[in-house]
Amino acid sequence: KHSLPDLPYDYGALEPHINAQIMQLHHSKHHAAYVNNLNVTEEKYQEALAKGDVTAQIALQPALKFNGGGHINHSIFWTNLSPNGGGEPKGELLEAIKRDFGSFDKFKEKLTAASVGVQGSGWGWLGFNKERGHLQIAACPNQDPLQGTTGLIPLLGIDVWEHAYYLQYKNVRPDYLKAIWNVINWENVTERYMACKK
């Protein structure tokens, strides 16, 4: 059974950039729903497997992708944020960003543009392409998980579903993007980068 991970900080810890009301709803309602629905879907999937019911297995794929992706994505997202975040990464990650995007500012512009440009709901990502040994920016619709759909290893995810910002930023997604850079946990992103380089 999957369970809702605890946040590594209080709901109000990311204010003024992301308010407590958003964080509480986002974590305790939205993420919790993905976890619950994933558990239900996996149970049904196990039953379908046991019966050899391929039609039922196929019918469950969208729910598995949506709720499984929602759980994976949010579990990364919470750790990608920190009340002590912001600024720039250091060391090897910063060097890789400069190598692959030209500069940290250019990287920020590109990931911001990819995230703002998502039509409807989805995510902007910084991922690691293991085959090429390079960082890449990608956008995924809905809750499609980055690694499961592109093969990139997720390092930093930016949730651009309206539930992530609407109560505070209304329909102005670029303002939310501008704010979120102040709470990016570069230590966590760096740990993820170093782990996938091994």
Swiss-Prot record:
E.C. number: 1.15.1.1
Essential cofactor(s): Mn(2+)
Residues annotated as binding Mn(2+): 26, 74, 159, 163
Chief site of localization: mitochondrion
InterPro entries in UniProt: Fe/Mn_Superoxide_Dismutase, Mn/Fe_SOD, Mn/Fe_SOD_BS, Mn/Fe_SOD_C, Mn/Fe_SOD_N, Mn/Fe_SOD_N_sf, SOD_C_sf
A single GO molecular function term of this UniProt record: superoxide dismutase activity
Gene3D superfamilies membership: Fe,Mn superoxide dismutase (SOD) domain, Iron/manganese superoxide dismutase, C-terminal domain
PTM annotation: Nitrated under oxidative stress. Nitration coupled with oxidation inhibits the catalytic activity.
Keywords assigned by UniProt, alphabetized: Acetylation, Manganese, Metal-binding, Mitochondrion, Nitration, Oxidoreductase, Ubl conjugation
GO cellular component, one term: mitochondrion
Protein location: Mitochondrion matrix
Top enzyme category: oxidoreductase
Note on how the cofactor is bound: Binds 1 Mn(2+) ion per subunit.
Assembly notes: Homotetramer.
Role this protein plays: Destroys superoxide anion radicals which are normally produced within the cells and which are toxic to biological systems.
Protein name: Superoxide dismutase [Mn], mitochondrial
Lineage: Eukaryota, Metazoa, Chordata, Craniata, Vertebrata
Gene, per the UniProt record: SOD2
